[in-house]
């Protein structure tokens, strides 16, 4: 299902959205699924429409991130990808009720998150539950962050499109 646009397919009462990046077919999954009035967004990362990592971390000789200065840029691009997927279902970040940030460096993530989350959600106190979890590895060596989202539609938004 390769494409540069957010594609969608409906099967068994589930509506799926894709970004057209290579790993969707390689791994075999949808970027987001809408069931009823709930949208589940799979782990998003900082990539462009062709699947190239945005603001990749520099790596040390062992192939691990040498520093975490790109955390803010990666976080911002990750939220932008989530916005694209949510829009496919008529939702925005205002509909997000829970997010989980998986990060390689908790301190760098905390330093970036205060600013980026407030900008992304457009408020000083985003109205969603948020989890920040330190992990030892993500999908790509240069990747510093991955975020999953759960969003709820209500009223007119929940009607089939």
Where do the model's predicted regions map?
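N-terminal presequence-like segments and the immediate start of the first folded domain
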Residues: 1-80, 84-97, 103-161
